[in-house]
Amino acid sequence: MKLLAVKVECSHELEDGLSFFMQDELDAQGIESRKRSDFVAEGQKHDSSLVELDDIENLPKDLELTAYFNYENADKKELVKKITDKIAEMKGYGLNTGEVSISTKEVADEDWNTAWQKYYHVIDFSRHLAIVPEWEDYHPAFSDQKLIRLDPGLAFGTGGHTTTQLVLLAMERALVKPMSVLDIGTGSGILAIAASKLGASHVLGTDISDEAVTAAKENIALNDVNNINVRKANLLKDIDDKYDLIVANILADILLELIPDLDSHLNKEGKVIFSGIDYLQLPKVEKALAENNFEIKMKMQEGRWIGLLIARKPD
Amino acid sequence: MKLLAVKVECSHELEDGLSFFMQDELDAQGIESRKRSDFVAEGQKHDSSLVELDDIENLPKDLELTAYFNYENADKKELVKKITDKIAEMKGYGLNTGEVSISTKEVADEDWNTAWQKYYHVIDFSRHLAIVPEWEDYHPAFSDQKLIRLDPGLAFGTGGHTTTQLVLLAMERALVKPMSVLDIGTGSGILAIAASKLGASHVLGTDISDEAVTAAKENIALNDVNNINVRKANLLKDIDDKYDLIVANILADILLELIPDLDSHLNKEGKVIFSGIDYLQLPKVEKALAENNFEIKMKMQEGRWIGLLIARKPD
């Protein structure tokens, strides 16, 4: 299979938003991110006098995001236009886009399949959680660290995204007993797997995309867990049960659609975790939560991204 | 020993700030907090039709904070004046003080020693951490939850304060390998104990107060840990070593004093956790961090309180 590679050079401020957009909206098969700051940080880990940044081949000016599309279905001109429009929209939010350039290239799938693996490594997320690519041999510093095995090429949620990480942290806080968990927009299944490893009694992961449902099932099979179900569903519309914990890592506008249906799907003393919220969109999410009788227990922010731990207001 | 009990009735918004003030600045021996919302929440855990709030004796209107002082040393009039001034100051920050009333009462120490215990219970803080009063028999839902044993009457840091909890969460995130940890203003020693239980290689806890140093040592002795030292020190002034992780849960003005000395006490790739910051004071902390070449990796907020996970800026 041939692939179309679309390379966007721009400011690192666009990384999360643009990755999200290209994977979720434009159906990219996979995304590579090369950031100047990663090379700088990597250099600092060694004796810095030995690492000359100028010697690195094609060192990115700031951020280089390369998205891979199925060549047969991809409309090159339209993709470039949509990405250009998205960047203009993000600029409208007040983000610094940097000097933007977009280029395209035709590549053989084989190249990509091996090439992108080198950009995914173990994410030593926290004291008790690490995300480990399927092919990596990893020896945790603490033997009781829980490992989430993932084929990060499969769907959104490689563990590297800030929005995913904010949910992981909030789950470590909230999951103090065996709870039932609903993961809306499960993507790669990473959050469903994490919930199970943390001790959820059972987990349902849902996604509107067939590809995500398949990917989540494949990732779940890589992990030693047996209490996760995955099925196709559009937010809470086809869900009948109630849960102790509902997590949703999707964009703010979709969270807004979800909020009115939360109460009827949440057990007594249930909690909700939201992520995927740009800080500029926080006020409207806060307003909708308050109007629906929810309150924010804890707010987490990394860069522009906000995650929320939410509960019903006390009467 | 006789005690002077000073009871402040006011809005729950003052709870953390006023507790901090009375314990740290006015040297209260202990503080009891009774909040209407706690009784409401407790009622909801049972069949709510059976719990009638009106039946509860002396149900607080909103918040009742009772601080206990050594009767011999306490100047009743001056204490009331200082608390009144503090509340006026907090009102100036924009807090809702509610209807404030302050009353004093003389009590026998024996009454208090038994009375306050009923206000401290297990804090099921997170999936992997719980704070357990010395006298409680606790069976965690997850057998690998790490327990911090505490005599919460001893010094500041009972585990119930938001500011303490934000540090606990940030430590769960940051302590991904055996690190050396410095806990500045250790109080009860709770954060030093947590760091050790999470797998720190060694921990130094410091406090400017002799009472806190004694209390921390007593609490450490309740826990099965052997790599914590505690000593009296004024912030970083008497500290020579460098650490992988520095935590400081103290008020914003004291954090500002600390910031210029951080760099020289932090190992390469070291991290810093700050808590005790009222959100109105965040801008000046952010400014001082930026001026000293630090950046905020993650911001956590609960109510008015902010906690920060901090690292050096990449070059």
Curated annotation (Swiss-Prot), chains A, B:
Source taxonomy: Bacteria, Bacillati, Bacillota, Bacilli, Lactobacillales
Binding residue positions for S-adenosyl-L-methionine: T164, G185, D207, N249
EC assignment: 2.1.1.-
UniProt record, GO biological process: methylation
PANTHER family for this protein: ELECTRON TRANSFER FLAVOPROTEIN BETA SUBUNIT LYSINE METHYLTRANSFERASE
Molecular functions per Gene Ontology: protein-lysine N-methyltransferase activity
Record-level GO cellular component terms: cytoplasm
Family: Belongs to the methyltransferase superfamily. PrmA family.
Subcellular location field: Cytoplasm
Gene: prmA
Main location group: cytoplasm
Reactions accelerated catalytically: L-lysyl-[protein] + 3 S-adenosyl-L-methionine = N(6),N(6),N(6)-trimethyl-L-lysyl-[protein] + 3 S-adenosyl-L-homocysteine + 3 H(+)
Organism field: Lactobacillus gasseri (strain ATCC 33323 / DSM 20243 / BCRC 14619 / CIP 102991 / JCM 1131 / KCTC 3163 / NCIMB 11718 / NCTC 13722 / AM63)
Name this protein carries in UniProt: Ribosomal protein L11 methyltransferase
Top-level taxon: Bacteria
Keyword terms: Cytoplasm, Methyltransferase, S-adenosyl-L-methionine, Transferase
Pfam families cross-referenced by the UniProt entry: PrmA
Gene3D superfamilies according to UniProt: Vaccinia Virus protein VP39
Function in brief: Methylates ribosomal protein L11.
Broad enzyme group: transferase
